[in-house]
Amino acid sequence: MKLSGFVSILVLFGLLARVQGPSLADLLFPRRCPRFREECEHQERDLCTRDRDCPKKEKCCVFNCGKKCLNPQQDICSLPKDSGYCMAYFRRWWFNKENSTCQVFIYGGCQGNNNNFQSQSICQNACEKKSSLT
């Protein structure tokens, strides 16, 4: 196939993605789960086993020492600190985007969001390196 034919197909896909909305674009160019090395203090309970266990735009990803539903388009490190609704007492780390550092907080054990890491090093691996690139 000539280069002009290839470029024409790419332009067509781009136009279709705008007309059909994000679902066609997601099928053609699927998003991936975040990848980084993590040294877990303990394995967390899996909250999903496959993508269809998750809400529509989320994928079942190995993340932060367990499987969790994540939206690959969402910047986890920009989420606010969220202790959750339960009354347990877990020392965790969250990434504070305002000062680009990982900070300790107390997690209640349920709900909350994915800006919630077992250790400072996992938080730094997931967020600080990415923050320094932007």
UniProtKB/Swiss-Prot annotation:
Species this chain originates from: Mus musculus (Mouse)
Keywords, comma-separated and alphabetical: Antimicrobial, Disulfide bond, Protease inhibitor, Secreted, Serine protease inhibitor, Signal
Name of encoding gene: Eppin
Keyword Signal tagged: yes
Signal peptide interval: 1-21
Tissues showing expression: Expressed in differentiated spermatogonia in testis. Expressed in spermatogonia cell lines GC-1 spg and GC-2spd(ts) as well as in the Leydig tumor cell line MLTC-1 (at protein level). Expressed specifically in epididymis and testis. Expressed predominantly on the postacrosomal region of mouse spermatozoa, in Sertoli cells, Leydig cells, and round spermatids in the testis, and in the principal cells of the cauda epididymidis epithelium.
GO MF annotations in UniProt: serine-type endopeptidase inhibitor activity
Segments of this protein annotated with the region Interaction with LTF: 117-133
Pfam families, A to Z: Kunitz_BPTI (PF00014), WAP (PF00095)
Disulfide bridge map: 33-61, 40-65, 48-60, 54-69, 77-127, 86-110, 102-123
One GO CC annotation: protein-containing complex
Region (Interaction with SEMG1): 102-133
Protein's name according to its UniProt entry: Eppin
